Each structure stands twice: as structure tokens, then as C-alpha cells.
Swiss-Prot record:
Residues 386-406 are annotated as: Disordered. It is an enzyme of class 2 (transferase). Residues 43-154 form the THUMP domain. It is found in: Cytoplasm. GO terms for cellular component: cytoplasm. Specifically methylates the guanine in position 2445 (m2G2445) and the guanine in position 2069 (m7G2069) of 23S rRNA. This is Ribosomal RNA large subunit methyltransferase K/L. InterPro entries: 23SrRNA_methyltr_KL, DNA_methylase_N6_adenine_CS, RlmKL-like_Mtase, RlmKL-like_Mtase_CS, RlmL_1st, SAM-dep_methyl-trfase, SAM-dependent_MTases_sf, THUMP_dom. CDD domains: AdoMet_MTases, THUMP_AdoMetMT. Signal peptide: none annotated. Keywords: Cytoplasm, Methyltransferase, RNA-binding, rRNA processing, S-adenosyl-L-methionine, Transferase. The gene is rlmL.
């Protein structure tokens, strides 16, 4: 009998052991890094041909004790290498393991190479050549403590290289790992769909299983073909049997397979891979966004299985969280009654799906530890009229979920729920407490909600800040926009470990969803630097989904997805309302107007005219849309220009001017760099020249530590009134340095 060691990726050894038993191999045993067994040459060939989980097939040639490099050399010198390959063939050595004397794998491989070369020279006066890539024959040395084992690699190139994938996408799954994922998913032959299929590996491997295609039958070469003891007749018999008798006819396959991806190029690659694998006729590929893919109409159930991109592939961890959260929403809505198997970088990411998993399995995708979790997506229940259940007082330490989104529908019940921190249960929304739950953060969130909801209801405030890095460990801002919640992650300092930052952010997402009992599609996640003023108008996406929110008598269009900012600066809510009260009968100028929300309030407050100036064409158009949303007509002008440059050439006079400049700006459209601390006097000087007698300027900025040059401003003929404290709304009281604000009134003399 021959001795074999079959290495495999971490997490696949149990599957490999079962697979070997199914091949008729007796007593396979798991060991570190793989499975070993005693068997025939035919069985070694069979593993090369049929194993879906093996990385290589290693035939043991010798095993001996090694205390130092000389022991390794002498032990290898005693192996009859000439009985395994001829001197005119090339060879290569793979070596793994170290001990106290052999501390480098390259050194270990070099000693084996020296022993082989010296033995050939001794017997034939010639030596074979080493070829690291595509060698005729490959050997493997493994050192464990004081024992070395030398193997012949029957597989040659790794067995995950099936032969059908000539082009792969970014960070592709190895075929062996894909097969393991499918096996662990619990798939029983039902329809299978991968909504992010990339180059198609998962769906192709599943189809090959269904058609009983031997994974090794597509390979052109194996490592044993130049081996002197190779039994060609035995190998050809096995290969013919696999090709002729083992494969089921395509027309007999009842299972249907579907693969979709957002990339047209990847789908084209996947189609070609499937054709090469012989499964192209049973797989239907399409170019579709995973968040929009739908099950085939005729299928009421099936298997969703996928490997979504990791944060490194997406570009940011926040993007990954957003993707997983949106996938959870969509899968629960569109694939009710299906099974779902998700392969991901970590358990915390999968918590963003908002589903409770059944079984989970640990794998490694190369060096990255990953997890596979299996879910049953509950079938949709018939729609029923829902009545809230009255809350019951609770003494539990852990706060139960409440539902603030029903405010106004059943106010007494909601108020009681907030007051008692008890559960507001809706039959259609049943939140299960997540595995990841930050209790301290949850308590602070509930405390803020309790304080702010009554205020918001009393003041008619629809959009407000619920949390703003109140606890240093949870460095996020959480805003409510009507029925939506936005979680904005502040970028952590470099000295904080990335893994710790990721874990805390996932704590936040999971806890917010549970505590607020959020409906499935009402959570938006963003990442941003801590703002320095209002300069960070970076575009994030192109969804162009607008939401109408109310502020006083005004209606505002906000965009929760496409930009870091939404179009409405919440901290300046009192300032905008103040402008509405001050603007009646006045000509109003709004510099650095952003989306012209202050101009909307001025117009609705009875301003004679409004002029809104900003460099951004996008935000000015947004401002015009805000005016249209409110049905505002009359003398209202929108000017796209550098505000500082425009002031230098303007001739119109105004009664009320609002100036809320960025902290810093070096836009390409500006001739000079703007710094609010250094340049505010010059800015206010220019603005004062456009001000009528008894006119007023409301000046504000967000620069931390900003110092108004009082003497210079007074010299311009202004009375100065600091309204910073009164201009900070209730929801920003926890951060009283969010902005500073002054009313500058021109002397009458």
C-alpha cells in the first residue's frame, strides 16, 4: 500500500475526509493541513481526478529524523530519485516547516535539491535541472519538529486550477473553496442563484456537481505524467470512465442555475468559463445589480449563495456595511421562502443582514479568515391590519426596541414607550436582539431619544441629530430625517486599530437597527472625515433619490445617499428660522448659499427679493428645486460664481445678508485660497459695502477655535451681537462648539 497526504485549505479537511470515504478509500484520517490515508496508485489517481476539495495529492517517498541540515541532506540522498524521474527531466522542490536548526524554508528546499543533484551525479555523472515553474516533476518536503517527510506531488499544479477559468475577476474564490462553500450551504439540488457571481466560480462548481463532472477531467496536465512509475493504462481507464459514464447528460439535469453581476465584463468571462467547464447550457447569466435581482417567476423557493465583496475590494469598510445592509433588506423582501448562504470576511459583517443564521462554518480564503452562514428567509405573511400593543413596564437592564417612526399615528402609545423605555411591538415588525449589541451605546441612544422626541414633536422638527459621538468609543453621528436614520462614521485617529474601529462601527449599526426597530429600508450609512466647516461636498453615489422634509413652514429636498452632506445643515435650523422672521419686506443676499435653504425661509418670510450665490452648479440647481417645491415665485436670483469675486463687482444693495462660509477652500474655481480665520475681515468688509443703512449681516462659521476680529468689525461701523448659544438647537446642545454666529448691525450714523 502507498501512503498519501492530501493537503487542503483550512476548514475543508472534514469535507475532504468524507469525500475520500465516498471514493472507497478506507480509514482516511484528518491531520494538520489535510488528510492522510493508505491506498493504491489507482486511488491516488482517483483523488486527482475526482476530489473537489483537495489542494494537492502527495505520495510519500520517505520519512526520517532530522536534527540538522546534514540529516536532511543524508536522508534525501538515500531516496532512489533515479527510479522516479530521468536526468533529462526538470524538477522543483516545495518545502514547508522549520525547526531549531533549519529555520528557513528556502534553505530546506536547497538541501533537498543538493541531495537530488548529487545522487544523480554520483550514479550518472549528470544532473537534472531545477525549474521553479512548470517543472516536469515536483517534490514536496515537510518538516515537523524533528521529522521530515518527502513526497512526490502527483497533482503538479494545484488542484483548484480545474482548467475552465483562464481569466478571473478581482479577489476570486479558489474552486476548491467554492466547492466547500456549496457543500456547507446545505444545497440539496434546488435552483441556485448567485447574485454577485463575478467570474462564476460558485455557480459553475455547483453545476459541475449536479452534472457529476469530475473536476480534474478538464485539466490538461498532472504531475505524475513524467513520473517513471506512472500507470498510463490505469489513468486512462479512470479518465474515460469519468468522461463517458460519470457525467450526466445536460438534458437530464433538472436543476437550474443563475448567475448575475453588475459588471458586464465579468458576466462575459463567467459565460466563457461555464462553456469551458461544460455547464454553459444549464446556467443563465445576466447583468444585474444584486440589490435589484429577482427570482425567476416560476420559482417559489431555491438557494441564494454568494460571496459579496470585502471592504478592501469595495474601497471602504463603510461601503461594505452599506452593501450588506441593503442586501439584507432586498433578500428578505424579494426572496422570501428561499435559503441563503453568505460567505463573508467576518461574523460582524453578516450581522448587517438583519437575519438570524442557522449553521455557520469557518473557512480561510487564502490568508483571510472568513465565515459561511446559512439562513432561512421567512416566507412572507399575508398583509393584515396592524394595531400596536400597549406597552408594559419592564425592569430589564437591556432596553427593548421601540419604534419612533410611528410618531403621530398613535402618540400616546409611543410617548409611553419612550417614557418607560419599553417595547412597542408591531405584528409586522419583530426584531430579534442581535448577537452584536452595545448596551452602553444603546442606553445613550435611548436617553437622547427620550429627551429629543418630545422637543421635536413640540417644535415641529422633522430632522434632527440624535447622537453625535457622545461616547468616544462610538465615534459616529446619527441623524433622523423624517422616517430615515443616517449613521455617519467619523474617521478614527490613525493610532486606533482598524479591527477595533470596524467592530465598534458594526456595534453601532447593529444596535441602532435593534433599538430603533428600523423598517428595513430606512437606514443610510456613510463614512466621512470630521468636518472642518462646510467644504466637504464630496459626491458618494449617483442614486439621485430626493426626500421632501419639513422645517417650519418650508419644505426642503434632501438627498440622503449621493453626497456626504444631505443638502440641509441641521445645526443651522434656528438661524434659518430667524432669517424667515427677519426677512419680511427686505432684499436678502445669501452668500455661500449651498442649497439655498436660508433663501427659501427668507422668501417664505416675505422677503422682497432673494439672491443666492455659490460656486456649485449642482447646489444652485438644488436650491432652485427647493424654491419650486415651495411654489415660490417672484424676484429670486441664483448666481453661480465665487462669492468673494462676485462681491468685488456687485452693485446691488441688500437689507439682510447671510454669510456662512467654509472653514477653508482652495477650489479650482477660486483664484486664491480662502481661510475663514485669516480672511473674514476682508469678506465682511466687501459685504458691508453691499448693505443698506440699518442693514444686518448674519455671519456664521464652523471653525473650531475661531476668533472674530471684534475691533476690525466695529471699525466697519457694526454693532456686534453674539447669538452663538441661541443659534445652537436642542439636538446640538451636546456639542456647543458646532458653530459660532453673530448679528452685525450697521450704524445709522
Amino acid at each position: 500500500m502507498l501512503s498519501y497526504f492530501i493537503p487542503t485549505a483550512k476548514g475543508l479537511a472534514p469535507l475532504l475526509e468524507v469525500e475520500l470515504k465516498e471514493m472507497g478509500i478506507e480509514n482516511p484520517q484528518q491531520m494538520n493541513g489535510g488528510v492522510k490515508f493508505e491506498g493504491t496508485l489507482e486511488q491516488g489517481y482517483k483523488v486527482c481526478l475526482w476530489s473537489r476539495f483537495a489542494s494537492r495529492v502527495l505520495l510519500k517517498l520517505s520519512e526520517f529524523k532530522v536534527l540538522d541540515s546534514m540529516d536532511l541532506y543524508l536522508g534525501c540522498s538515500n531516496i532512489p530519485w533515479e527510479t522516479h524521474f530521468d536526468v533529462d527531466k526538470t524538477f522543483s522542490i516545495d518545502f514547508s516547516g522549520t525547526n531549531d536548526e533549519i529555520r528557513n524554508t528556502q534553505f530546506g528546499a536547497l538541501k533537498i535539491k543538493d541531495a537530488i543533484v548529487d545522487r544523480f551525479r554520483k550514479h550518472f555523472d549528470e544532473r537534472p535541472n531545477v525549474q521553479k515553474r512548470d517543472a516536469d516533476i515536483r517534490f514536496n518536503g515537510r518538516l515537523w519538529k524533528d521529522k521530515a517527510t518527502i513526497y512526490l506531488d502527483l497533482s503538479g499544479s494545484p488542484l483548484h486550477l480545474r482548467g475552465y477559468r483562464t481569466i478571473a475577476g478581482e479577489a476570486p474564490l479558489r474552486e476548491t473553496l467554492a466547492a466547500g462553500i456549496i457543500k456547507r450551504s446545505g444545497w440539496q439540488g434546488e435552483a441556485l442563484l448567485d447574485p454577485m457571481c463575478g467570474s462564476g466560480t460558485l455557480v459553475i462548481e455547483a453545476a459541475m456537481m449536479a452534472l457529476n463532472i469530475a473536476p480534474g477531467s478538464l485539466r490538461e496536465t498532472f504531475g505524475f505524467e513524467k513520473w517513471k512509475k506512472h500507470d498510463q493504462e490505469c489513468w486512462q481507464t479512470l479518465k474515460t470512465s469519468a468522461q463517458v459514464y460519470g457525467r450526466r447528460a445536460v438534458n437530464q439535469c433538472e436543476t437550474r442555475f443563475y448567475g448575475s453581476d453588475l459588471s458586464k465584463d465579468m458576466i462575459e468571462i463567467a459565460r466563457k468559463n461555464a462553456q469551458r467547464a461544460g455547464v454553459g447550457e444549464v446556467i443563465e447569466f445576466s447583468v444585474t445589480d444584486a440589490k435589484k435581482v429577482l427570482p425567476p417567476e416560476e420559482l417559489e423557493t431555491g438557494m441564494l449563495i454568494t460571496n459579496p465583496p470585502y471592504g478592501e475590494r469595495l474601497g471602504s469598510f463603510s461601503d461594505t456595511i452599506t452593501l450588506y445592509t441593503e442586501l439584507g433588506y432586498h433578500f428578505k423582501d424579494a426572496f422570501a421562502g428561499w435559503n441563503l448562504s453568505m460567505f463573508a470576511m467576518d461574523t460582524e459583517l453578516l450581522s448587517c443582514l438583519g437575519m438570524r443564521a442557522g449553521k455557520s462554518f469557518k473557512f480561510f480564503n487564502g490568508p483571510i479568515e472568513c465565515v459561511l452562514k446559512n439562513y432561512r428567509i421567512s416566507p412572507k405573511r399575508p398583509a393584515v391590519e396592524v394595531e400596536p400593543v400597549a406597552p408594559k413596564k419592564t425592569n430589564k437592564e437591556t432596553p427593548e426596541p421601540i419604534n419612533p417612526w410611528t410618531m403621530g399615528q398613535n402618540e400616546s402609545v409611543v410617548e409611553a414607550a419612550i417614557e418607560n423605555e419599553s417595547e412597542l411591538v408591531f405584528k409586522e415588525v419583530q426584531q430579534i436582539k442581535p448577537a452584536i449589541y452595545a448596551e452602553e451605546f444603546a442606553n445613550r441612544l435611548l436617553k437622547n431619544l427620550k429627551q429629543l422626541e418630545k422637543w421635536a414633536k413640540r417644535e415641529g422638527v422633522e430632522c434632527y441629530r440624535l447622537y453625535d459621538a457622545d461616547l468616544p468609543e462610538y465615534n459616529v453621528a446619527i441623524d433622523r430625517y423624517a422616517e430615515y436614520i443616517i449613521i455617519q462614521e467619523y474617521r478614527a485617529p490613525k493610532e486606533i486599530e482598524t479591527q477595533k474601529v470596524r467592530r465598534r462601527f458594526l456595534d453601532v449599526v447593529s444596535t441602532v437597527r435593534y433599538v430603533l426597530n428600523l423598517p428595513d429600508d430606512k437606514l443610510v450609512i456613510k463614512v466621512r472625515e470630521r468636518q472642518k466647516g462646510r467644504q466637504q461636498y464630496e459626491k458618494l453615489d449617483t442614486k439621485k433619490q430626493s426626500l421632501v422634509v419639513h422645517e417650519g413652514q418650508a419644505k426642503m429636498l434632501v438627498n440622503l445617499q449621493d453626497y456626504l452632506d444631505t443638502g440641509l445643515f441641521l445645526d443651522h435650523r434656528p438661524t434659518r428660522l430667524l432669517i424667515g422672521n427677519m426677512a419680511k419686506g427686505k432684499d436678502f443676499l445669501n452668500l455661500f448659499c449651498y442649497t439655498a435653504t436660508a433663501s427659501v425661509h427668507a422668501a417664505l418670510g416675505g422677503a422682497k427679493s432673494t439672491t443666492s450665490v455659490d460656486m456649485s452648479k449642482t447646489y444652485l440647481a438644488w436650491g432652485e428645486d427647493n424654491f419650486a417645491e415651495n411654489g415660490i415665485k417672484g424676484k429670486h436670483e441664483f448666481i453661480q460664481q465665487d462669492c468673494i469675486k462676485w462681491l468685488q463687482h456687485a452693485h446691488e444693495m441688500y437689507d439682510l445678508i447671510f454669510i456662512d462660509p467654509p472653514t477653508f477652500s482652495n477650489s479650482k474655481r477660486m483664484n486664491d485660497v480662502f481661510d475663514v480665520q485669516e480672511d473674514h475681515v476682508a469678506l465682511l468688509t466687501s459685504a458691508s459695502q453691499r448693505l443698506n443703512k440699518q442693514g444686518e449681516i448674519i455671519f456664521s462659521n464652523n471653525k473650531r477655535g475661531f476668533k472674530l476680529d471684534v475691533d476690525a468689525i466695529k471699525a466697519l461701523g457694526f454693532y456686534i451681537k453674539d447669538i452663538s448659544q441661541s443659534s445652537i438647537p436642542e439636538d446640538f446642545r451636546r456639542n456647543k462648539k458646532i458653530h459660532q454666529c453673530w448679528i452685525l448691525t450697521k450704524h445709522t450714523d
